[in-house]
A protein has these predicted regions:
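Asp-box/BNR beta-propeller blade signature and adjacent active/binding-site loops
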Residues: 1-357
Length: 357
């Protein structure tokens, strides 16, 4: 398989501020009206700060140009990972998650940043957390032009759920941790999310092993109903992807199996191309830093791994790629990374194609 990368550019940043200019953890999809929609956490100070908002950019020309970022979710807490999924005739779900005020104070305690501390002091902590703390989502019923109120789920994942044949959404994610700490009952669980925001528990995926955290999964449902889940599994010195499958609609899952080396990279995003090929793109946080992908020609039974899309990263704060197929058959992948040594992370786009050797 030959890989041809023919475009890379920055598509989402903040030219008006050197302070609130960090963007990360994007997702991209094609809406029902043909436009592309990219969401991310933006207008941040840095990787961990209380100022994150979920923003959206739109493209009407297959990613040649994008609108400026518009805010979709903005709670008093730190709105992180942006996920997006269209479903039904005109509905669009945008997902995020946040963490507690305590977590923000704990993370930023070494910096003693008066700006951050002043903001945290201004929050009505109890009221904000009672209303917003959790894995959050909003729903649009007009192809992403307007969105309803913030609602919450018990699980979280970077790129959001996937549509089911019956009109619901299959939401497979890590159980939400309010302080972003490893919990005793931490695991990956499957839920069915309905269009009205209600949900029901389906099943669980067993953890790989004690001491290894399973988190940040992404899911795909194949035409025959097979469900494939790629899971980030990590601890210090271990950062890779495992795969689990379900053949009964998410009620039960196979024991996760390792796909990459112990430092192979994560988290992943799965996409089925028009010819049936599956691709799973993931961040690579070892030198040379960048974005890689694997592909499968047999519905995820086997994978050809460690194909490089981009390897010019300036450090390990990058990744979370997400892909969509363009009308001409090419693939558009978004991810986050710094553009310069001194600059903040911004959202990048790559256009590429796979051809037979």
């Amino acid at each position: 398989m030959n890989i041809q990368v023919f475009e890379k550019k920055v598509i989402c940043f903040n030219p008006d501020s050197q302070l609130h200019s960090y963007f990360a953890w994007p997702s991209v999809t094609r809406l029902q009206d043909g436009r592309l929609m990219m969401v991310a956490s933006g207008f941040r100070l840095k990787h961990i700060c209380p100022f994150g908002k979920v923003v959206a950019c739109f493209s009407e020309d297959e990613g040649e140009t994008w609108t400026k970022p518009a805010v979709i979710i903005d709670t008093p807490l730190d709105d992180r990972d942006g996920g997006v999924v269209p479903f039904g005739e005109k509905s669009v779900l945008v997902t995020s998650f946040n963490n507690s005020v305590w977590a923000q104070r704990n993370w930023n305690s070494n910096n003693n940043d008066p700006y951050i501390n002043a903001y945290l002091d201004s929050i009505d902590e109890k009221a904000a957390e009672e209303k917003y703390l959790g894995s959050t989502f909003v729903i649009s019923h007009d192809c992403g032009r307007t969105f309803g109120p913030v609602m919450r789920m018990p699980v979280t994942c970077p790129h959001g759920p996937v549509p089911m044949k019956d009109g619901g959404l299959l939401y497979i994610g890590r159980t939400f941790s309010p302080h972003n700490l490893v919990m005793e009952d931490d695991h990956i669980a499957a839920y069915k999310l309905n269009e009205d925001g209600t949900y029901e528990k389906l099943g669980d995926i067993e953890n790989v092993a004690p001491g290894l955290l399973s988190c940040e999964p992404h899911t795909i449902i194949l035409p025959d109903g097979k469900i494939i889940v790629h899971i980030r599994v990590h601890k210090r010195g271990f950062f890779t992807i495992f795969q689990s499958e379900s053949y009964d609609g998410g009620m039960t899952f196979t024991k996760p199996r390792q796909l990459l080396g112990d430092q192979g990279g994560a988290p992943a995003h799965l996409l089925r191309l028009n010819d049936g090929t599956l691709i799973s793109a993931y961040g690579y946080r070892e030198e040379p830093y960048g974005v890689r992908f694997m592909y499968s020609k047999d519905n995820g039974e086997t994978w050809s791994t460690e194909h490089v899309l981009w390897d010019q990263g300036l450090g390990n704060d990058l990744g979370y790629p997400c892909s969509v197929q363009l009308n001409n058959g090419d693939i558009l992948t978004v991810f986050y990374a710094r553009e310069t040594e001194e600059g903040p992370a911004v959202i990048h786009q790559i256009k590429w194609r796979m051809t037979a050797e």
